Amino acid sequence: NHIHDAPHMAVQFTGNDHLIAHNDIHHVCLESNDAGAIYSGRDWTWRGTVIRDNLMWEITGFENRGCVGVYLDDMLCGTEVTGNLFYRVTRAAMIGGGRDVLVENNLFTDCEPATHLDARAMNWASYHVGTTMKDRLDEMPITDSLWAERYPELLTIWEDEPAAPKGNIIRRNVCQGGTWDGVRDDARTYIDMSENYVADD
């Protein structure tokens, strides 16, 4: 697909196990800032989506104030972001307090920053944990055999510091130009950030 010149998102997904691949996305979110070219958020149970082999470029938000490339908002978990090319995207790969996200084998060029991880559920967004997030978890049949086999992390998430952004991996990416590391200090202890190549200007 070729998705471009749009006022808001290019792709929004909900649910599980989607494949979002081989899209050319540019000049979207032209009238938006707290938005993403590819967006989902605020549900621990929406897992298994793979975002791969996409080209995302010139995505900077309304009046260049900044938006997001892949926006995993408000504790979204279990998503893979692999093999994408980002050029001139603000917050190209953003993990908004979620866990079990893999960002691997992507190329970031002139992004500000290339990667972002925060621990929002442990501070300013903590009110979602015992309300929206818990309610949506309880609505799903996570103890049924199919769910338990496919998403075993959901069986223990409520007892395992559910607000902590655990299990995130950012590795084997390449960053040229722009800013590489937008990981917040309160989230840094929870991330495996390794084997990335950041080119010097």
Predicted regions and their residues:
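Glycine- and acidic/polar-rich repeat regions and solenoidal domains
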Residues: 2-201
